[in-house]
C-alpha cells in the first residue's frame, strides 16, 4: 500500500455526536446560547476532529511549500521566477509576512522546498523534499507527470504523519511560487467547468493586458492538456503545481491523522480542492482561513463547502491568513475549556 492509498483509506467522517456534546457544553456556559457565534463552531468542530473534549492547540505549525512554475515563461506574473528562492531565504531568516504573523499567534513556520528551480545546498532550517526543479509550462504540455504529482502528494502526507508523531495540534498551509495563481485558476476551471475569466484574477497585481494574456494561457493549457475532472490526480498533473500537490497531500495526511488543518488562500485552497476531490470527507477537517480577493477563491470555497473565517482583502499567500485564523480557532477552544458554566459561576440561567 502506498502512502497515498493508505491515507485515503484512513479518512472518515468526524463524529457528529461529539460535536453535539461539545455544543451542549457550550450552551451551558455563562452566556446566551449561541452568542459567541462562529467561535462556538470552531470549538465544537475541533472536538469532533480530534476526538478530545479539551482539544490541544499549543503546538501550531504552518508548512510553507515552495515551488516554481514553467508557465511563468508565458508572462503570467509581475515578478520573475528568481523571487521564489529569494523569498525562501527570507522565510528562513524570519523576515516575511508569514514569519511575523506566525510569531504573533505562537506558531512555527516550516519551509519546504518541494519544487524550486534552485540549489539551496545545506541551507539550515530548510526541509528539502524536491520532486523536480519546477513544473513544465502547461501551455505547451503537461505541468508534471502523474508520477511526479503523486510523489509531491506523498511529500505532504509524510510531513503530516511526522507532525502527528511530534504532537503538533494545529496545522496551517502556506506556499510560495511565482506564477502559482495561474495553475490554481486552471485547477478550479477544470473541476468547475466555469469559463476561465470567471475564476482568474490579477495575482501579484498584473495589469489588464497581462490579465487577458493570463486568461488566454490558461484556456490554451486546458484545451491542450484536457485534464479529466473525474480524475483529480490528472488535473493536478496536467495543470497544477508541485507546492499545490504538497499542500493537497499535507491536507490528506492531516485528515487521515485527525489533525485539524487551517487552509490559507487561493493557492492553498486549490490544494484543498484536489484533496476534497480525492476524498470528500476531507472537508470535515478543514478550516478555511479567509476569503481572498482572487475571484476564483469563492468558487473553490463553495465547491468544498467551506465558510471563510476572515475577509481582510488578503492576497499574499505564504500562510498569512491561516496564521491569523489559528488565533481565532484557539480562542474558540479556550471558550469551551476555560469559560465557567452557570453552575460553576453561581449565575442563574436564562429561560429559552
UniProtKB/Swiss-Prot annotation:
Pathway: Nucleoside biosynthesis; alpha-ribazole biosynthesis; alpha-ribazole from 5,6-dimethylbenzimidazole: step 1/2. GO terms for biological process: cobalamin biosynthetic process. The active site is at residue 318. Gene3D superfamilies: 1.10.1610.10, 3.40.50.10210. The keyword Heme does not apply. Signal peptide: none annotated. GO terms for molecular function: nicotinate-nucleotide-dimethylbenzimidazole phosphoribosyltransferase activity. It comes from the Bacteria. SUPFAM superfamilies: Nicotinate mononucleotide:5,6-dimethylbenzimidazole phosphoribosyltransferase (CobT). Its EC number is 2.4.2.21. Pfam families: DBI_PRT (PF02277). InterPro entries: Nict_dMeBzImd_PRibTrfase, Nict_dMeBzImd_PRibTrfase_bact, Nict_dMeBzImd_PRibTrfase_N, Nict_dMeBzImd_PRibTrfase_sf. Catalyzes the synthesis of alpha-ribazole-5'-phosphate from nicotinate mononucleotide (NAMN) and 5,6-dimethylbenzimidazole (DMB). Belongs to the CobT family. This is Nicotinate-nucleotide--dimethylbenzimidazole phosphoribosyltransferase. The gene is cobT.
